Amino acid sequence: MTSLTIPGLDQAPTTHARLLSWVREVAELTTPDRVVWCDGSQDEWQRLTEQLVEAGTFKRLEKKPNSFYAASDPSDVARVEERTFICSREEKDAGVTNYWMQPDEMKAIMTELYRGCMRGRTMYVIPFCMGPLDADKPKLGVEITDTAYVVVSMHIMTRMGSKVLERLGEDEDFVEALHSVGAPLEPGQQDVPWPCNDTKYITHFPEERKIWSFGSGYGGNALLGKKCFSLRIASAMARDEGWLAEHMLILKLISPEDKVHYVAAAFPSACGKTNLAMLQPTIPGWRVESLGDDIAWMRFGEDGRLYAVNPEAGFFGVAPGTNWKTNPNAMRTIDQGNSLFTNVALTDDGDVWWEEMEGEPQHLTDWKGRDWTPQSDEKAAHPNSRYCTPMSQCPILAPEWDDPNGVPISAILFGGRRKTTIPLVNEAFDWQHGVFMGATLSSEKTAAAAGKVGEVRRDPMAMLPFIGYNVGDYFQHWVNVGKEADSSKLPRIFYVNWFRRDESGKKIVWPGFGENSRVLKWIVERLDGNAAAEDTPIGRVPSADQIDLSGLDTPREDVETALHVDVEEWKAELPLIEEWFASIGDSLPSSMRDEFEALKQRLGA
């Protein structure tokens, strides 16, 4: 099929020469039946969701307005880290945490995979913007995809459509993001509800600011504005331009006196990031408003402070474990509708359900389409099942969430899921020590990434799967950001662990969720000079007396266990840090080695 015969290709609502040329090149390679330029309108949403219902990909939910359920192919349920590549020109620029292939070699392989891969399908062109569209220099992208599921998800997760195309004008720069599920259809061939391919590649070309994804229709592999652009490509941009692109929530903490602090926090997947982002404090008079639950782009303002903006427009949250106790604000957000649910379970009356949601039904249809009862062996919802919902529906959304200038960050938190060793909260001695804390962040593996659940792995700044360049250079970039700033204006860095267990290893000693507001209160009191801490070998840690425990029904000894710094446990941690740093090799900054030696000295090791 020549380009002349592909309907829609020549009806482009733009005169942007590079965009037109790229779209034509992709269409000629992938040979779709038609090309559709997405405008982001409500009509487009209606049309595509109806198409997806007819195709069997979506089921319309009876109990949530304008909301839909999808079940993926059981082989396509999570990010595939072993099929995710950073194809920098030089292998050393990808570093030890990324898979690398020579860019031309990768392009040759993927070009053959893309050849004819959209046959029988529609090619959608999605202009999108990460972050507010009225920013001085917005970060623009265009995703080409062959699945309407991606288009409607991008409606929720990004600012997209005609307004972005206008902003692109005739020659504005943009990130090229090419996606195909890799499932061409022969004439008369019946489609499947969730097309995908056993061969998967999620590839990034950081110097060229390009993303090529093939074979997966799932979330982060297919919604290329999310991890691919906002973290992997953006982290490379941030290194070059002197800012930070991070896997962080942004929250606004308001004291009873209406004093405001903005906090950014980095946690690996399934460690409570979304719950903290939408926290409902249990201590009287304190309030939280949300600005984002997953990604923060931070750059210095004219006043020398670090300002954060959330590049996304929606929440793409892990469903299991989300309920009216753990995250009432997420439940209120999705209850308003206009949402997509993938790989959760379906109730008999046309609603969604997942593990730990209130009121377990006696019968469900599980994510694989089978009958499910409480006696069933398998879980009804996949552990990495997701809701995709507009941020604008969040009842505690901070009005500043859409401000292109961002909000000034007072504190940065790092945290992971550790049963031992790491105390409830720990303040860094200074910025460089805080970078060391982030660089050595560790967590037990979760379901969001394929692999063995439960093993402890290093997850620097919760960015292990998302750093778009060499991890050692990434640490150096963090150190440089601190060196080039006025240290009095830098955010203070803290490390938290909500998941410490008692000696039996069975009970999590800190109640978490809304009670985490007590830890946030201590943190902002530290910022304001109104709270004490004890200097320990690992940082500044409060005693139980220094945290507001009023009205908390957790035994004091449990709080003390949560805060305890066990020197012997920390000595056992040292070889693990040593091994991690050794794996990074020559690119590890000397400052990180210095911090490690200083920690050893303080521990008497």
UniProtKB/Swiss-Prot annotation:
SUPFAM superfamilies: PEP carboxykinase N-terminal domain (SSF68923), PEP carboxykinase-like (SSF53795)
Positions of Mn(2+) binding: K227, H247, D294
Chain residues that bind GTP: A270, C271, G272, K273, T274, N275, R386, R417, F513, G514, E515, N516
CDD domains, per the entry: PEPCK_GTP
A GO cellular-component term linked to this record: cytosol
Catalytic activity, reaction form: oxaloacetate + GTP = phosphoenolpyruvate + GDP + CO2
Compartment(s): Cytoplasm
Key words of the record: Cytoplasm, Decarboxylase, Gluconeogenesis, GTP-binding, Lyase, Manganese, Metal-binding, Nucleotide-binding
Cofactor list: Mn(2+)
Residues the record lists as binding substrate: R79, Y218, G219, G220, S269, N384, S385, R386
Bias (Basic and acidic residues) ranges: 364-381
GO terms, biological process: cellular response to glucose stimulus; gluconeogenesis; glycerol biosynthetic process from pyruvate; oxaloacetate metabolic process; propionate catabolic process; response to lipid; response to starvation
UniProt entry tagged with the keyword Flavoprotein: no
Disulfide bonds: none
Superkingdom in the source lineage: Bacteria
Pathway assignment: Carbohydrate biosynthesis; gluconeogenesis
One Pfam entry name: PEPCK_N
Name of the top EC class for this enzyme: lyase
EC number(s) stated in the UniProt entry for this protein: 4.1.1.32
Entry similarity comment: Belongs to the phosphoenolpyruvate carboxykinase [GTP] family.
Function: Catalyzes the conversion of oxaloacetate (OAA) to phosphoenolpyruvate (PEP), the rate-limiting step in the metabolic pathway that produces glucose from lactate and other precursors derived from the citric acid cycle.
Name recorded for this polypeptide: Phosphoenolpyruvate carboxykinase [GTP]
Native source species: Saccharopolyspora erythraea (strain ATCC 11635 / DSM 40517 / JCM 4748 / NBRC 13426 / NCIMB 8594 / NRRL 2338)
Taxonomic path: Bacteria, Bacillati, Actinomycetota, Actinomycetes, Pseudonocardiales
Gene: pckG
